[in-house]
Amino acid sequence: MQLALAAKYIGASIATLGLGGAAIGIALVFVALINGTSRNPSLRSTLFPQAILGFALSEACGLFCLMISFLLLYAV
């Protein structure tokens, strides 16, 4: 019983590593937005919606990792 509980905690902690990847992805999206806007300020209106889409996709991947972690902790 203790081994199964330890495996559950280890699996949940490994699943949360994806949150770090999502954070890095979000940072890279906004770094690219700042670089693009600083190089050509007139493109801000076209770059910003694409950056928000990239943010949403990166955040969704992070939330999926968090959801899997919670499922491993509380549903299995």
From Swiss-Prot:
InterPro entries assigned: ATP_synth_F0_csu, ATP_synth_F0_csu_DDCD_BS, ATP_synth_F0_csu_sf, ATPase_proteolipid_c-like_dom, F/V-ATP_Csub_sf
Topology of this chain in the membrane: Multi-pass membrane protein
Gene Ontology terms for molecular function: ATP hydrolysis activity; identical protein binding; lipid binding; proton-transporting ATP synthase activity, rotational mechanism
One Gene Ontology cellular component annotation held by this UniProt entry: proton-transporting two-sector ATPase complex, proton-transporting domain
GO BP of this protein: proton motive force-driven ATP synthesis
Annotated positions for site Reversibly protonated during proton transport: 59
Keyword Transmembrane helix in record: yes
Transmembrane segments: 14-34, 52-72
This protein's UniProt keywords: CF(0), Hydrogen ion transport, Ion transport, Lipid-binding, Membrane, Mitochondrion, Transmembrane, Transmembrane helix, Transport
Places the protein is found: Mitochondrion membrane
Subunit structure, as described in the record: F-type ATPases have 2 components, CF(1) - the catalytic core - and CF(0) - the membrane proton channel. CF(1) has five subunits: alpha(3), beta(3), gamma(1), delta(1), epsilon(1). CF(0) has three main subunits: a, b and c.
Function: Mitochondrial membrane ATP synthase (F(1)F(0) ATP synthase or Complex V) produces ATP from ADP in the presence of a proton gradient across the membrane which is generated by electron transport complexes of the respiratory chain. F-type ATPases consist of two structural domains, F(1) - containing the extramembraneous catalytic core and F(0) - containing the membrane proton channel, linked together by a central stalk and a peripheral stalk. During catalysis, ATP synthesis in the catalytic domain of F(1) is coupled via a rotary mechanism of the central stalk subunits to proton translocation.
UniProt family annotation: Belongs to the ATPase C chain family.
HAMAP family: ATP_synth_c_bact
Record protein name field: ATP synthase subunit 9, mitochondrial
Organism: Candida albicans (strain SC5314 / ATCC MYA-2876) (Yeast)
